[in-house]
Structure formats: C-alpha cells, structure tokens
Curated annotation (Swiss-Prot):
Protein name: Protein cps3
Pfam families, per the entry: zf-CCCH_4
GO biological process: meiotic cell cycle; mRNA metabolic process; protein polyubiquitination; protein ubiquitination; ribosome-associated ubiquitin-dependent protein catabolic process
Gene name in the database record: cps3
Region Disordered, annotated ranges: 318-346, 471-490, 504-532
Gene Ontology molecular functions: ubiquitin protein ligase activity; zinc ion binding
Function in brief: Responsible for supersensitivity to the spindle poison, isopropyl N-3-chlorophenyl carbamate. Has a role in meiosis.
Chain positions of all zinc fingers (C3H1-type): 35-62, 64-91
Superkingdom of the source species: Eukaryota
A GO CC annotation given for this chain: nucleus
Organism classification: Eukaryota, Fungi, Dikarya, Ascomycota, Taphrinomycotina
Organism per entry: Schizosaccharomyces pombe (strain 972 / ATCC 24843) (Fission yeast)
InterPro entries recorded: MKRN-like, Znf-CCCH_4, Znf_CCCH, Znf_CCCH_sf
Chief location: cytoplasm
Length: 583
C-alpha cells in the first residue's frame, strides 16, 4: 500500500506533514522553537562555549548581571531557598542573598576563577575586614620581599619580649620544624598577643608564639609567611644547634636526671595551641604506673638511658632525646653512684635498684606467653623461662650501660623496691629443648593416658576387623575370640544371623564330644602343682597319652565336618566382600 492510499482525505495528509515524527516534513512546516535568547549562556560566561554565534543562548554579559526576580519567593513558597538562581526581593525593595549574588559582577565574562571560587570570594581577616581575592593574587615579588623584611624586624622585637634567649628561639623553631607539627597555629582565643600573655600569667605555662604578627599601620594582620620564614632558617651545624649556646648554661633548664624528666614533655592538651609545657612526665602518672605519652614499646629501650642525663648529644634529629655517653666499665658492680638531686638532695643508685625493671621487662614477654596457651605445661614453662632469660639479659645490659637511667625508668612506671621479684633461673633448666614433646602422646594428661590404655585391646581388635565383620569371622580372625552371642565390631545384616546359627549347630553335631571336652577344659585344671606325689604325676602322663590318641582318632573322623565349615566360611567372605563393594 502506498502513501497516497494511506490517507482518506487531505486533512489527514496535512496532519502527517505537520507531525514532528515525519522525517520528510520541511522546516517550514515545523513549529518554530521557543526563543532562549533571554537566557544567558553559562558556558560563555565561563569561557568554554564552542557554539559561537550559533548558540541558542544569549552571550550578552549585561543580561547575565540582571537577575530575574523570583515570583515564588514573593508568594512565599520558593522551595530552593538560598540556592535559588533568581533574585529574592522583599516587598520593601531589599534583596536577600542567594546564589545569584555569588559571582563577582565586575570581572564576569573573562575569568572562570571567580565562578569556581564563588563560595570563597572574600577573605575575612582578624579585624573583620573583607578583603577581595584579587588583592591577595596581585601581590608582586617585591612586595613579598618587603613583607619578609618587615616580619624579620618584628621577630627581633618578639625575641626581646620572650624570656628565653634568641638562640633558643631559633633552636625551638628548628625543633618544631623537625618534629611532627608539635607547635600548631594559635586559635582565635589566642589571636592577640595580649591574650597570650594573660594566659601565660594565669596558667604559669611558658608560651612560644607559633607565628608572628606583622604590623601594617594601625591594624594587625596575621601573616602565615612569618612561620615560613622561621622554618626556613638553616642551621649550619649538622650535629646539634644547642652546642656552645646559652641553652645548656641557662638556669631555667634542669641539670639533674629527675629534673630532666620533667622538662621536655609536650602535653597532648597543648597541641593546637602553640604552648609548650615543661613537664615530660606527670608525677601523678608516674606514681600510678601509667605509660609515658611519648614512649612506645619499641622505643623505650633505646630512650631509657638517654633520660638520665641532662644534655643533648650530637645527632641530626632534634625532636628526640638520644642516648647519653656510656658509663665507664671501671665502675664496680657493687659500687653505688651519687648524683645531685633536686633542692640539694642526692640520688644514690646501686645495681640492686635494677630489680625494679624485672616487672617492666616481663611485660614485654606477655605475647609470647599468650601464644603458648593451649599447649602442654612443659612447653608453657619453657616459654616462661625463655622470657625471663631475655629479661635477665636485658636488665644486665642496661645495668652495664647506665644504672641510674634504668632505675629512673622503672620508678617512672610505678615499680618499687618492695614489689620487685627475683627471677633467678636454675641451672637445671639450661637445656630448654628437653621440655619439647617428642610426640602428641606426651601431651596427654594421666587420666587421658589411662583411659586410652584401657581401650587398647578393643582398638586392636576393632581395627583388625572389618566394618562388615560377622560373628564367625570375628572369632576366627581376632586374637581374642568372643562368644557367639556378642559382637566384636559392627554386626552384619540380620539376614545372616539365622544362617550362622544353623551352621554352628551343624558343626557342633559333627564334632566329637571328646574334642569339645579338650577344647573347653584345658589341661591347666590338672596341672602337677595340684598333685602331691609322683604317682599322681605318672597318672597324669598316662591320661595325657590317652587323650592324645583319642584326639588323633577324632580328628580323622571330623575332616568332613571341617571341610563343610571351610566352604561356608568361603561363601561368607564372598558375600561380605560384595556388601563392601556395594557400600
């Protein structure tokens, strides 16, 4: 059927040509699309429109600045709220801030940075002044240099106000640059220098400015470049910036081991505030046996001797105290050493004080003990003895290295002389391999071993018998025959019971009574020990010969019966094998 015959009249043909689904309809017959020239092109505003003059949207920037008033907001039912793209104008003419005000109106068509940075178009400083983004981006290199010079002058003024020497200030900033952001930026509550000083007066905590205030006229602006200039200061000495400075000779720093423990700790509460405290260990936590905050399990052994001295050794790492010089070996093991303490007191350290470390070091062996749970008592004791052996060697090394540091470390973890335990290992436990079991049989308890030995005979007989073992075959194959009314192993099917009983009765009838008497009544009943004289012995021998002759005659008569029993046993074995093959 052709198209001409498809239409009944001309009106149907017109509808066909005006249809949007007709590909043969011309552009003149189609309805004109809705004009979108009043809608600004978002791609042109961002500089990414590729349509050019053929774009159906408007490329006029003036139209983009003039926002259409939201009619829904005037009615009170705009569901977009502050995200609405139209202007929200109140009845009195005031405009409510919406997304329409986010882009800058002055630099609208040329830059796409203003659109992408609309939520952060303005920067609010500490004195609540709105600074445009362009003022920060238009700073030249010369202005940066002048700013750094001004900040360097401010640094010198700040150093005069701080109670510590200038060399310590440089070292402290290098210290903060080498560690993991120990000093962070001061919050809004400490934004002004006056508030920082008031805070230090109230709490008695020494404060170090995290970054410096750069003064520009009457207003103060916090500049992050001061922190950069401080961290960029290079230390010429590769060993330690504290050597030869006033840091070691200053009276504000301790010169005793105990005072040194209370001087370098930076409490976690001061993180994020730029405040450094003087306490490395809290005395309350030391009395309670708590773990120091900056010591971990792997690092405590290497840092323990270093805390006993009041100097910093020459290493490239400024952020961590290191090991102190070793104690000369000429010091006797039984001699005590005296060190100056706090307020004129004297610290006396003897090798016996190292016993406080035994509970500390025994904690390091807890995972080994836990891993040995569930094993035999012998292996558990060997693990425990091995851990105590390592404890003894560890403490002996610490004793030869620095006896004072080890005793102080033990006292800081809450151990005392009274609570110490002496883990002396006897010589009989020198060979730990003797406690390793050779087989699983040694791991059984005495009750389990006795129970297993009591079932030994049954295990042998049951293992030698088949799963489909019958009464007769179990009596023939087993070393310990059982009566016919009991089973040795899993019994066979019930259809063989009558078969076995019938052939058993036939075999008993065919066997002479003398053979049954010999088999059921052994010669042990007439042993010579029950007789009193030689006459009885001779009579017994005669009876034995008589029995022997009777047995020979009865065996010849019973050949036929034994052949019948053997044939039945062969048949039984074949049927049992067939049962096993089917299973």
């Amino acid at each position: 059927m052709t198209k001409k015959n498809a239409f009944k009249n001309s009106e149907d043909m017109k509808k066909y040509h005006l249809s949007e689904f007709n590909s043969e309809a011309t552009s003149l017959t189609r309805p004109s699309p809705k004009s979108l020239q009043h809608v600004p092109c978002k791609f042109f505003r961002q500089g990414t429109c590729t349509s050019g003059k053929n774009c159906i949207f408007s490329h006029d920037l003036e139209l983009a600045t003039e926002k259409t008033i939201c009619k829904y907001f005037q009615k009170g039912n705009c569901k977009f709220g502050s995200k609405c793209a139209l202007e929200h104008v109140l009845p009195d003419g005031r405009k409510v801030k919406t997304r329409a005000f986010a882009p800058s109106t002055t630099a609208m068509g040329s830059s796409s940075q203003n659109i992408s940075a609309a939520p952060m178009a303005n920067i609010i400083s500490n004195n609540d002044k709105i600074l445009p983004m362009t003022t920060m981006a238009s700073a030249t290199a010369s202005e940066e240099k002048n700013r750094i010079k001004d900040e360097a002058l401010v640094i010198k003024k700040e150093e005069s106000n701080v109670a510590i020497p200038s060399e310590v200030t440089v070292a402290a900033n290098a210290f903060s640059a080498s560690t993991e952001d120990v000093y962070s930026i001061v919050g809004d509550s400490l934004s002004k220098k006056a508030s920082v000083k008031d805070f230090s007066d109230v709490t008695g905590i020494e404060t170090i400015p995290a970054y410096v205030e750069a003064t520009n006229g009457s207003s103060t602006v916090r500049s992050p470049h001061a922190k950069r200039s401080l961290s960029s200061i290079s230390v010429k000495s590769s060993t330690s910036p504290f050597s030869g400075s006033k840091f070691l000779s200053s009276s504000s720093y301790p010169h005793t081991p105990e005072a040194h423990l209370n001087s370098n700790h930076i409490s976690p509460a001061s993180f994020g505030s730029g405040i450094r405290t003087r306490n490395i260990f809290n005395p309350e936590s030391m009395s309670l046996g708590l773990k120091p905050p900056i010591l971990n399990r792997s690092y405590s052994a290497s840092m323990a001797p270093g805390f006993s001295m009041n100097t910093f050794t020459a290493t490239g790492n400024l952020g961590r105290p290191t090991k102190s010089p070793s104690v000369p070996t000429s010091v006797g093991s039984n001699k005590s050493r005296k060190f100056p303490g706090i307020n004129g007191s004297t610290l006396t350290a003897t090798p016996s004080s190292l016993e406080n470390l035994y509970p500390l070091s025994s904690r390091r062996s807890v995972p080994n003990l836990i891993s040995s749970l569930g094993t035999s008592p012998s292996t558990f004791s060997s693990q425990f003895l091995k851990s105590t052996d390592r404890t003894h060697s560890f403490t002996s090394k610490l004793q030869s290295f620095n006896p004072v540091g080890t005793s102080l470390l033990a006292s800081s973890l809450g151990t005392s002389q009274e609570d110490s335990v002496n883990y002396d290992i006897p010589d009989e436990f020198a060979n730990e391999e003797d406690f390793i079991p050779n087989s699983l049989q040694e791991l059984l308890t005495p009750e389990e071993l006795e129970r297993k030995m009591s079932h030994g005979d049954e295990a042998v007989s049951s293992s030698s018998a088949s799963r489909f073992m019958s009464k007769v075959s179990s009596n023939l194959n087993s070393g310990n025959p059982t009566p016919y009314n009991s089973y040795n192993g899993t019994p066979t099917s019930s259809r063989f019971v009558a078969f076995f009983d019938r052939h058993r009765q036939e075999s008993e009838k065919a066997t002479p009574p003398s053979l049954n008497k010999v088999s059921q009544e052994p010669l042990t009943a007439t042993t010579p020990k029950n007789l009193g004289n030689l006459t009885a012995i001779s009579e017994t021998l005669e009876n034995g010969q008589t029995l022997k002759s009777n047995m020979a005659s009865s065996i010849e008569k019973s050949k036929t019966s034994t052949e019948v029993v053997a044939s039945y046993d062969t048949t039984l074995d074949e049927e049992t094998q067939f049962q096993m093959d089917e299973a």
